[in-house]
Amino acid sequence: MLKDDASVMVGGFLRCGTPARILEEILKNDVSNLTLIANDTSTPDYDRGKLVVNKRIKKAIVAHIGTNPETGRQMNAGELEVELVPMGTLVERIRAAGAGLGGVLTPTGVGTMVEEGKKVMEIDGRKYLFEKPLRADFALIYGSKVDRFGNVFLTGSTRNFNTVMATAADTVIVEAEELSEEPLDPDEITIPGIFVDYIAV
């Protein structure tokens, strides 16, 4: 399903709420030149980090690379393009895509290297950067519990990027920690099943 040159959002914050089993399956296939959209590139020995180490990623759009020295090495060697985006801005760009918006305005990054190549707008005397929405071909997300209709429950911090990414991709695959044959209680649902295309168990 996932092919070369696809753009892929991957939920999680370091190792919390990451669809690690799906990423292991991707590593078993000969898929490369992926554009990764995630909070971070994890660590070299885990999930997103293994994709970097195995040179499956051509571009990473992330907020943080400090826990994976291989990301920095490949970036400095010109082997990997890295677009560093402030974390709040990254989330808002994804949210904007999911909501069908044309972008977001943020004061974060004005007057810094983040501003380079971006449109600066002044509103009521304050400068803002215009940030384009981020959408992907695939979103790989995690679910603490998923029912057979694709409704997802996320516990605690596992919500992180998973909730917003589910709205901003053409195809959404959720990795279920627990699969429920019974429908989830509506009060439990974090991500409605309408956003989910496939369930991986």
List PLM regions with ranges:
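Conserved alpha/beta enzyme-core scaffold
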Residues: 1-201
